[in-house]
Amino acid sequence: MQVLHLCLAVSIAVALLSQAAWSEEVFDDTDVGDELTNALESVLTDFKDKREAEEPSAFMTRLRRQVAQMHVWRAVNHDRNHGTGSGRHGRFLIRNRYRYGGGHLSDA
């Protein structure tokens, strides 16, 4: 959503700049250039601050989920009656057992 806002702000700024260039307005006589520059700088800094604040938590959430899934599948694959995953066909035995109704695992 933030990327959409950033793209929208940049496209509006480019449209205004191109309109001003085609109508040959000079930015020195008006405050349009300064206003556009300030608006773009504020949008970019706001986007950068939010992205840096949100990405580490999202990354850690994804990493925790992957680690949890790894532990779940390691526990599922550790079975003495069927393949342990170390043999040649062990993973196929486990996969087929869970695919055809032997065990039920919900992948959260």
Curated annotation (Swiss-Prot):
Annotated organism of origin: Aplysia californica (California sea hare)
Its job: HRBP is a myoactive peptide that excites Aplysia heart and enhances gut motility in vitro.
Protein name (database record): Abdominal ganglion neuropeptide R3-14
Alphabetically ordered keywords of this record: Cleavage on pair of basic residues, Neuropeptide, Pyrrolidone carboxylic acid, Secreted, Signal
Post-translational modification: The partial formation of pyroglutamate from N-terminal glutamic acid in peptides isolated from single cells is detected by mass spectrometry. There are indications this modification depends on a heat sensitive factor.
Modified residues (Pyrrolidone carboxylic acid (Glu)): E24, E52
Modified residues (Pyrrolidone carboxylic acid): Q66
Tissue-wise expression: Neurons R3-R14. A cluster of 12 giant neurons located on the right side of the abdominal ganglion.
